[in-house]
Curated annotation (Swiss-Prot):
Lineage per the UniProt record: Bacteria, Bacillati, Bacillota, Bacilli, Lactobacillales
Protein name per Swiss-Prot or TrEMBL: Bifunctional protein GlmU
Subunit-level organization: Homotrimer.
TM stretches of this protein: none
Binding site for acetyl-CoA: 333, 339-340, 358, 376, 393
Catalysed reactions, as listed in the record: alpha-D-glucosamine 1-phosphate + acetyl-CoA = N-acetyl-alpha-D-glucosamine 1-phosphate + CoA + H(+); N-acetyl-alpha-D-glucosamine 1-phosphate + UTP + H(+) = UDP-N-acetyl-alpha-D-glucosamine + diphosphate
């Protein structure tokens, strides 16, 4: 494959999202859309990834180079802004709001575009509204014209072959051809599609890959597709999901073979789940949760930045945050790892085979040694040594005849009287 630069068009204002976050930074399955694009293109080792951004944006942490489009004058003008950074023989141009685009789509574009000055990805859509229509030259697989939705005639709107917004160009060709692009359209903008007559048409295998995001509803739709793809891949690797439709796993999560994931589970980015785990139902494994082999994380358990050793059981109603938990530990229901002092987060360490009693509160920084115990209901603020039991609660006192002092006595008397009357009825 020839050297290729990638230009990501990311300068659009994204006003239809109706929020203050830059559109390319909206997340799909835990990753910004811009990162999805970068992950796809990096797989074929481009020479440079260049983002064209607005004056108020900074995408430098995602790409190799950035350039600013000072005015929104159209896609051709955006690409022109990137010309000083282009050094390779060919370039791929792609919009920043296409998180479902795959490496295979881009490789197919490069391979089938060989020998052409330009090529573009297309899809055959049953409902093409909103997309530019691709008009081919007769039966040939090359472009005669691309017409944007707002500029199309009634007959052109009936066409189903649409422009995906992903292009391959010979650099020398597009640097010449872009000078012939005019603003003779309804938007008075420089359309990059006007430089595509004669371009090779390359159709994607899965039309979902070309879906773009302009609204919150579209963001939700592509997120649903992305999560299904993630779940399908995880299940293909030997993981059981009781209900994939209610299992939400981010893109950069690893799950080991033989693990069972129950409904309502959420597993967030940078987490690694070991083999033979049982997760859920209704478990929330937040970022940087790492589990060993044969770990059980049950219903209504939340973890974050936690390393959990082999054979450990965290059954229910527990928060484990900023923690290192050893092997074969039992953490009872209602346990809270108290990790935040109002300013800083602190670590809790629990050694192998420790037993944490129900409703314990471990106030970090604190360490529970191997084979140590905390008594149920304790608030542990000091380290507990090996083989010791930490108890931090007041001894129980029973006060006799206390019921009669409470208002419950009158209520109970009235309740009993009413039920006695019902029992007397035939």
């Amino acid at each position: 494959m020839s050297e290729v630069d990638v230009v990501i068009l990311a300068a659009g204002k994204g006003s239809r999202m109706k929020d203050d976050l830059s559109k390319p930074l909206h997340k799909v399955a835990g990753l910004p859309m811009l990162e999805w694009i970068c992950r796809a293109v990096r797989k074929f080792n481009p020479k440079n990834i260049i983002a064209v951004q607005g004056a108020d944006e900074d995408f430098s942490s995602y790409v190799d180079e950035t350039v600013v489009q000072k005015e929104q004058l159209g896609s051709a003008d955006a690409l022109r802004c990137a010309f000083p950074k282009i050094d390779a023989e060919k370039l791929i141009v792609i919009n920043a709001d296409m998180p479902l685009m795959t490496e295979n789509d881009l490789v197919d574009l490069v391979e089938k575009g060989e020998g052409f000055d330009a090529a573009l990805l297309t899809a055959d859509l049953k409902k093409p509204f909103g997309y530019g229509r691709v008009i081919p030259v007769g039966e040939r697989n090359v472009v005669e014209q691309i017409v944007e939705e707002r500029d199309a005639t009634a007959d052109q709107k009936k066409l189903h072959l649409v422009n995906a917004g992903v292009y391959l160009f010979r650099a020398d060709y597009i640097k010449r051809a872009i000078n012939n692009v005019t603003t003779d359209n309804s938007q008075s903008e420089y359309y990059l599609t006007d430089a595509l007559p004669g371009a090779k048409i390359v159709q994607v295998a899965d039309w979902h890959d070309i879906l773009g995001v302009n609204t919150q509803q579209q963001l939700a739709a592509v997120s649903k597709i992305a999560r299904k793809r993630i779940n399908d891949q995880i299940m293909a690797n030997g993981v059981t999901m009781i209900d994939p439709l209610t299992t939400y796993i981010d893109a950069n999560v690893l799950v080991g073979t033989g693990t069972i994931i129950k409904p309502g589970t959420v597993i967030e980015h940078d987490s690694v789940i070991g083999a033979e785990n049982e997760i859920g139902p209704y478990a929330h494994l937040r970022e940087k949760t790492v589990t060993g082999i044969d770990v059980h994380i049950g219903n209504f358990v939340e973890t974050k930045n936690a390393k959990i050793g082999d054979h450990t059981h965290i059954g229910h109603l527990t928060y484990v945050g900023d923690a290192e938990v050893g092997q074969a530990v039992n953490i009872g229901a209602g346990t809270i790892f108290v990790n935040y002092d109002g300013k800083n987060k602190h670590m809790t360490k629990v050694g192998d085979r420790a037993f944490i009693g129900s409703n314990s509160k471990l106030v970090a920084p604190v360490e529970i040694a191997s084979e140590a115990i905390t008594a149920a209901g304790s608030t542990i603020t000091d380290n507990v040594d090996q083989h010791a039991m930490g108890i931090a609660r007041q001894r129980q006192t029973n006060k006799s005849d206390f019921w009669q002092r409470m208002p419950h006595e009158d209520f109970a008397t009235e309740y009993d009287a009413k039920h006695d009357q019902r029992d007397d009825q035939p």
